[in-house]
């Protein structure tokens, strides 16, 4: 019973996160922290622009609260909004900006390079951006852009690297955008992957059916 409840809560939080991700596009949504209290459920929303989460005269936050209560069966939801202090070090926000730029027709390479400069300029120890899908033409491929220090696998990668995956809907199809950031304050282990100061690009092609 405890395990079933735990799984149910995780699924619920994931659905709420997806709802906020869609609803709070203009707010620069990052993530939520959901905690149950004796009087209800406290949901802390982290975003680049808290004003968009609250809305004019609190209209948006009221709408979010009502939706959580009626459609997601959240008991007495209490929404608190916190601003992300360093948006260029938040992989969700960085990934969303990249996806939005791609949807507006910006070239993926220029967009990725610009994002990496902002991330590293904010003091990150390392950053990796992976763009996958039909970027041009009918053939799917994966483009990787990296700078700084990055741990790619094992426990250090899970503990030290913040990751996010976003989707960009283009005319040729859906493109995946993965962002990995190693923040300035992390303590690096002895074994790390050292990249040069130049942004590196790696292209990987995969088979895709011709339409």
UniProtKB/Swiss-Prot annotation:
Domain KH type-2: 16-85
SMART domains hit by this protein: KH (SM00322)
Domain of life: Archaea
Keyword Metal-binding: no
One GO-annotated biological process of the protein: translation
GO CC, one annotated term: cytosolic small ribosomal subunit
Alphabetical list of HAMAP family matching this protein: Ribosomal_uS3_A
Job of this protein: Binds the lower part of the 30S subunit head.
Name of this protein: Small ribosomal subunit protein uS3
Source species of the chain: Methanococcus maripaludis (strain C6 / ATCC BAA-1332)
Gene that encodes the chain: rps3
